[in-house]
């Protein structure tokens, strides 16, 4: 499949870079969290509160299975999607996976800068929780096809496009 799949921690820039990549490549953008919100007619926060995290992860898995038939998409995943059910391996079947790596210190700055009420796992700007999440997830994220240090927006876009074209053999 010829898709780009963006993975990484919450606040790593997946949605922002995804929008720009989709414009550059003229691919449709699929944001898995937004898709789930539309399917459920509820916010992610409400879904977690009413049904719990396991229910949410089941919805993510259904989306992955639907995306296996798609091409020419930029897919921005929720931060936990690659982690659960060994989904990283399923994502690699869907397309070119890109881990947007952001240093923990930068993620903490981004979290503290704004209040992220919509993100159920980042409630109360808990830096210790974010640090623990980072440590638990990094090894799985690093299984992506390529790793981009996403601290410079324009450089990240250029690097992703180049790596994707190389992967495709262009």
Swiss-Prot record:
The EC category is transferase
The answer to whether keyword Membrane applies is no
EC numbers on record: 2.7.1.71
Could you confirm whether the keyword Cytoplasm appears in this record? yes
Residues binding ATP are 11-16, 119
The protein's superkingdom reads: Bacteria
Q: Which HAMAP family match?
A: Shikimate_kinase
Keywords for the protein's UniProt record, in alphabetical order: Amino-acid biosynthesis, Aromatic amino acid biosynthesis, ATP-binding, Cytoplasm, Kinase, Magnesium, Metal-binding, Nucleotide-binding, Transferase
Question: GO terms for biological process?
Answer: amino acid biosynthetic process; aromatic amino acid family biosynthetic process; chorismate biosynthetic process
What is the role of this chain? Catalyzes the specific phosphorylation of the 3-hydroxyl group of shikimic acid using ATP as a cosubstrate.
Q: Which family does it belong to?
A: Belongs to the shikimate kinase family.
Taxonomic source organism: Clostridium botulinum (strain Hall / ATCC 3502 / NCTC 13319 / Type A)
Q: Which Pfam families match?
A: SKI
Q: Which reaction does it catalyse?
A: shikimate + ATP = 3-phosphoshikimate + ADP + H(+)
Q: How cofactor binds (record note)? A: Binds 1 Mg(2+) ion per subunit.
List the Gene Ontology MF annotations in alphabetical order.
Answer: ATP binding; magnesium ion binding; shikimate kinase activity
Q: What is this protein called?
A: Shikimate kinase
């Amino acid at each position: 499949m010829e898709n780009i799949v963006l993975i990484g921690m919450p606040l790593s820039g997946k949605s922002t870079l995804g929008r720009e990549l989709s414009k550059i490549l003229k691919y449709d953008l699929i944001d898995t969290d937004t898709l789930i919100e539309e399917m459920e007619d509820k916010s992610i926060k409400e879904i977690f509160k009413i049904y719990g995290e396991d229910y949410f992860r089941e919805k993510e898995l259904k989306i992955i299975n639907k995306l296996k038939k798609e091409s020419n998409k930029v897919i921005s995943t929720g931060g936990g999607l690659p982690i659960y059910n060994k989904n990283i391996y399923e994502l690699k079947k869907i397309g070119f996976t890109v881990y947007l790596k952001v240093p923990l210190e930068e993620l903490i700055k981004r979290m503290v800068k704004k209040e992220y009420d919509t993100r159920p796992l980042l409630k109360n700007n808990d830096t210790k929780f974010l640090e623990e999440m980072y440590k638990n997830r990094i090894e799985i994220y690093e299984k992506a096809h390529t790793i981009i240090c996403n601290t410079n927006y324009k450089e990240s876009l250029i690097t992703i496009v180049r790596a994707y074209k190389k992967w495709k053999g262009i």
